[in-house]
Amino acid sequence: MKHIPRKRFGQHFLADQSVLDRIVQLIDPQPGEALVEIGPGLGAMTDPVVERCKRLTVVELDRDLAARLRKRPELTVIESDVLKVDFTALAQAAGRPVRVIGNLPYNISSPILFHLLEQVASVQDQHFMLQKEVVDRMASAPGSKDYGRLSVMLQWRYQIESLLDVPPESFDPPPRVDSAIVRMLPLAQPPAVDPKLLGELVTVAFSQRRKMLRNTLGRWLEAREHGGAFDLTRRAEEVPVAEFVALTMAIQQTPSNSPLTAGATPDAA
């Protein structure tokens, strides 16, 4: 029986074989690797991937699709909301970091990316189909209109590369937006920064992105007793990722912002 895509799950199934072939080529799955596919759907990407790697773990929320997938012995099916999946446990069970792939539901793509960011130490790499606008934001450089919180929060921990643009007609049903394939490689030696503090800083900095940082970040820094040098006569979109990270690390050195005290009085900003 034909599966009808469910709007509430953001289902748009990739149907263009030439695009599928190119995606699998870019992923280059190998036997013995611990691959996890998010949202396998009807198996368009699943089939050529598992043909190469022989075993595959899939995460599928749609119970009807999960039931179909369970009939395949080469697949380990996790019927769950991906935001509840413990990728660290999957890596530990496999005895190696996981490679995460998938055509992500566009309506929850950012929460999925941040869920994986929290477990990035257990990830070898990530290859995703996403809304092109999101990929552009993920990979953008300072000074670009697309550069923002998402750019900083992912680039401090990943090397990000947009690999391939995919038009709407490659899907069934076609989405209303263009899509793109992105590759995310965790940095081998990431800076020793507190992700929560960095996230708070970046959120404040970009809260009014057209204003000078002295009007947004200035008070936040004062509240944290930061007296170091940082140019506040810029807009947030002009500040490189490395500077946001360095500023966060400097704030971490302030006694009142140490891990033992930083969470005691959360800032209302």
Curated annotation (Swiss-Prot):
S-adenosyl-L-methionine binds at H12, L14, G39, E60, D81, N103. Transmembrane segments: none annotated. InterPro entries: KsgA/Erm, rRNA_Ade_diMease-like_C, rRNA_Ade_Mease_Trfase_CS, rRNA_Ade_methylase_Trfase_N, rRNA_adenine_dimethylase, SAM-dependent_MTases_sf. The keyword Cytoplasm applies. It is an enzyme of class 2 (transferase). It is found in: Cytoplasm. HAMAP family: 16SrRNA_methyltr_A. Its EC number is 2.1.1.182. The keyword Transport does not apply. Keywords: Cytoplasm, Methyltransferase, RNA-binding, rRNA processing, S-adenosyl-L-methionine, Transferase. It comes from the Bacteria. This is Ribosomal RNA small subunit methyltransferase A.
